[in-house]
């Protein structure tokens, strides 16, 4: 019996966006300059704290997901960084207008322009964590590799409502994945993988020129940035994978990887699926963790603990209902000699914001 690997988003999106840049052939400009060492590993901390960074070179860091060796928002480290509760902080990725990446438009859009039925959420409505990315530059101007860590302040019940009941019912921890990547790689109109972008604008211009459309949702069928496929539309990202429950979190993966939009028709939804790729171009060529524990075994009965890719699935055609329809039917077929999908609930944060 063959089994595919899927993590299912555990919660309905509040409203979100992302942006895309870089491609799979991006050259590594980093050297062997001493990497930045963080005084605390990513995870959950009951109270705010001061984070120390150390390296042989001058340290620069960012808090917006961008690469500090390339970003114009990088800050030169000159002392401890305060890591505190971010409740109520201004949204960034969640502030992007859903109109830019969703085609669930009002049926009156024909006369009034494209108007999404969903508004971006308020600052208070989006749970947040802190993501610090840091790199060091030596006297010759050479950069180290970028180090990234994700921090949650307070208890996990403060961040994820119902996590205690969820873990008790499932008998296991909840998967929480923090995705960090450049904003433009998600939302830029030319290279952003999450938005409709230039590809959609060109298709839409031809579409309205035909003057035969009946309702705004017809635009879901149009080509867009998010519907593009292949390595050209893969972007570089970083993931922090935590196994979480009401008592704390274990960081089981801290890894750079590739990311693409996943799905077919659901690519035009507000909450889109992601496919993650481990490649030597980004570091390790495998995700080395038994994500599904003893549930997933090879033909010899050994637990599978290395993966080249896995999917963060937002629900597909069931995204607006239970989200778990496919997962349920797959479990019923698990004992049959055919291909099935292993899955488990997962909560996703994007550049420090609940997605």
Label every PLM stretch briefly.
Residues 179, 212-355:
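Conserved ATP-binding subdomain of kinase catalytic cores across diverse folds
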Residues 17-20:
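C-terminal motif of bacterial Sec signal peptides marking the signal peptidase cleavage site
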Residues 4, 22-25:
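Generic cytosolic/nucleocytoplasmic N-terminal low-complexity/intrinsically disordered segments
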Residues 1-8:
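Bacterial N-terminal signal peptides that target proteins for export
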């Amino acid at each position: 019996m063959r089994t595919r690997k899927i993590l299912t988003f555990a919660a309905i999106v509040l409203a979100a966006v992302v942006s895309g840049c870089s491609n799979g052939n991006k050259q590594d400009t980093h050297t062997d300059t001493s990497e930045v060492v963080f005084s605390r590993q990513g995870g959950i901390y009951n109270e705010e704290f001061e984070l120390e960074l150390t390296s042989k070179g001058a340290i620069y860091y960012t808090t917006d997901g961008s690469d500090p060796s390339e970003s114009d928002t990088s800050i030169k480290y000159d002392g401890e960084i305060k890591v505190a509760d971010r409740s109520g902080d201004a949204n960034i990725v969640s502030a992007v207008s859903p109109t830019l990446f969703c085609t669930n438009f009002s049926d009156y859009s024909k006369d009034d322009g494209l108007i999404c039925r969903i508004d971006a959420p308020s600052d208070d409505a989006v749970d947040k964590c802190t993501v610090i990315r840091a790199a060091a530059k030596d006297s010759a101007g050479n950069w180290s590799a970028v180090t990234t860590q994700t921090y949650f302040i307070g208890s996990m019940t403060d961040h994820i409502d119902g996590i205690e009941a969820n873990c008790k019912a499932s008998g296991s921890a909840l998967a929480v994945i923090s995705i960090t990547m450049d904003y433009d790689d998600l939302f830029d109109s030319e290279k952003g993988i999450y938005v409709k972008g230039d590809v959609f604008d060109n298709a839409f211009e031809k579409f309205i020129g035909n003057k035969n459309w009946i309702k705004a949702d017809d635009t879901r069928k149009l080509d867009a940035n998010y519907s593009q496929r292949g390595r050209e539309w893969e972007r570089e990202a970083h993931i922090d994978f935590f196994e979480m429950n009401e008592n704390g979190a274990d960081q089981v993966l801290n890894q750079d990887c590739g990311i693409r939009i996943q799905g077919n028709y659901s690519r035009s939804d507000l909450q889109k699926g992601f496919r993650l790729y481990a490649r030597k171009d980004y570091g390790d060529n495998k995700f080395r963790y038994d994500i599904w524990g003893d549930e997933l075994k090879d033909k010899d009965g050994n637990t599978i603990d290395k993966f080249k890719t896995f999917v963060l699935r937002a629900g597909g055609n069931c995204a607006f209902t239970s989200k778990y329809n496919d997962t349920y039917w797959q479990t019923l077929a698990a004992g049959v000699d055919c291909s099935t999908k292993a899955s488990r609930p997962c909560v996703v944060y994007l550049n420090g914001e609940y997605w």
